[in-house]
Amino acid sequence: MANSPQAKKRARQNDKARAHNASLRSMVRTYLKKVVAAIEAGDAETAKAAYAVAIPVLDRVADKGIIHKNKAARHKSRLNAKIKALSA
């Protein structure tokens, strides 16, 4: 348990940041699920539209360090490959 005033404040700040980061991670997962659902449904146009919406969100979260930039790049690459395979 934090005893000093600054330790108590840091604990409060950490709780707030953790909740915010969890919210952002959840948002990213939701966008990615929409893309995957469109791909599984075989709907290329919906998948492309969902992908176009998800990519800026993914990049923004990666820039903030919520997820690693390589993980964001991996998601983008794999989803794009699946969409291209769907269109071909």
UniProtKB/Swiss-Prot annotation:
NCBIfam families, per the entry: S20
GO biological process: translation
Ranges where the record places region Disordered: 1-23
Function: Binds directly to 16S ribosomal RNA.
Record protein name field: Small ribosomal subunit protein bS20
Superkingdom of source: Bacteria
SUPFAM superfamilies in UniProt: Ribosomal protein S20
A single GO molecular function term of this UniProt record: small ribosomal subunit rRNA binding
Family in the record: Belongs to the bacterial ribosomal protein bS20 family.
Any Pfam family matching the protein: Ribosomal_S20p
Keywords tagged on the record: Ribonucleoprotein, Ribosomal protein, RNA-binding, rRNA-binding
Cellular component GO terms held in the UniProt record: cytosol; small ribosomal subunit
Gene designation per UniProt: rpsT
